[in-house]
């Protein structure tokens, strides 16, 4: 399966005219996403305000990427798990069966943060819990008839490294 960079699908213009076979993005497109930022802390049922992006924004990026039916979405900075949440919702809406790979360092949340106060030992733990909640919520909603209804995920934890410290 070939990887297609988002840059090959990215469209940018304000005059509604396609260029070089690419679709046009209106200049006012981002206004709605800007408004979403005010409610982003509430998304996913997880209290984590630092760095969250709106699910709707990530779903729009998925559409622009022209994913194939069984596309793979990779996020090297998983954080609260917004990308996986968006993939689940997008699959439920359009019937595709995208999968996701999230990567997150074993980062400890700030002791003063809501995430730490709710008992999450790491950001990865928080992300996994969000995926459980998001999957359950997606399955409770209306789903595309062609979708396989797969909201499962696996966690691979790297326990130790064979890399020598170089600093």
Please place each PLM-identified region on the residue numbering:
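Class I S-adenosyl-L-methionine
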Residues: 1-72, 94, 107-110
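Short non-domain terminal segments
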Residues: 8, 18, 75, 151-154, ...
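SAM-dependent methyltransferase catalytic region
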Residues: 113, 117-167
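Hydrophobic/aromatic beta-strand patches that form the interior of the parallel beta-sheet core
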Residues: 30, 101-103, 156
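Conserved S-adenosyl-L-methionine
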Residues: 55-137
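Intrinsically disordered, low-complexity boundary segments flanking structured domains
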Residues: 11-20, 88-90, 136-145
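Intrinsically disordered, low-complexity regions
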Residues: 3-5, 9, 102, 123, ...
